[in-house]
Curated annotation (Swiss-Prot):
Ca(2+) 1 binds at D34, D36, S38, T40, E45. One of its GO terms (molecular function) is calcium ion binding. The lineage of its organism: Eukaryota, Fungi, Dikarya, Ascomycota, Pezizomycotina. This is Calcineurin subunit B. Residues 21-56, 60-88, 90-125, 131-166 form the EF-hand domain. Ca(2+) 3 binds at D103, D105, D107, Y109, E114. GO terms for cellular component: calcineurin complex. InterPro entries: EF-hand-dom_pair, EF_Hand_1_Ca_BS, EF_hand_dom. GO terms for biological process: calcineurin-mediated signaling; cellular response to pheromone; conjugation with cellular fusion; intracellular monoatomic ion homeostasis. Regulatory subunit of calcineurin, a calcium-dependent, calmodulin stimulated protein phosphatase. Confers calcium sensitivity. Belongs to the calcineurin regulatory subunit family. SMART domains: EFh.
Length: 174
């Protein structure tokens, strides 16, 4: 990673919401996280960050960053994943990231089972499974406008349109 060529960095800058200086700072952070100098960040290295390890959705976040499903995150995936959180990221990018949290199988829809799994990660044992399932069923019923039993990205967008996703998913400093 230390030998990242200028043209590779330029391509990463072009494909993200970051400028060259921000990408360089991210590269330095990436290198610190890559404790074994493998050029990728493994799950355990991600979880060594206190901000990540205490997040109930940490495993989902890592899976979203790992775009190719290889089990680790390379620098390009790292920048791409963080790009949605940039103040220069638009609302759709932030909504797509939020949608991916729930779309575990990456089929473009949130199923009843996927919604249950992710909400279970968030509430833990604070709700009984039966109570949680009722919430999931009600959410699917309300959000599923075309009545196909699952939530598409468009339906998800309509469901959260009155919440300020842009503000809650923006980090000021990189």
């Amino acid at each position: 990673m230390g030998n990242t060529t200028s043209s590779v960095l330029d391509n990463i800058v072009q494909g993200s919401n970051f400028d060259r200086e921000e990408v360089d700072r991210l590269r330095k952070r990436f290198m610190k996280l890559d404790k074994d100098n493998s050029g990728t960040i493994e799950r355990e290295e991600f979880l060594s960050l206190p901000q990540i390890s205490t997040n109930p959705l940490a495993t989902r976040m890592i899976a979203i960053f790992d775009e190719d499903g290889g089990g680790d995150v390379d620098f390009q995936e790292f920048v791409s994943g963080l790009s949605a959180f940039s103040s220069k990221g638009n609302k759709e990018q932030k909504l797509r990231f939020a949608f991916k949290v729930y779309d575990i199988d990456r089929d473009g829809y949130i199923s009843n089972g996927e919604l249950f799994i992710v909400l279970k990660m968030m509430v833990g044992s604070n709700l009984k499974d039966q109570q949680l399932q009722q919430i999931v069923d009600k959410t699917i019923m309300e959000a599923d406008l075309d009545k196909d039993g699952k939530i598409s990205f468009e339906e998800f967008t309509k469901m959260v349109e009155n919440t300020d996703v842009s503000m809650s998913m923006t980090l000021d400093q990189f």
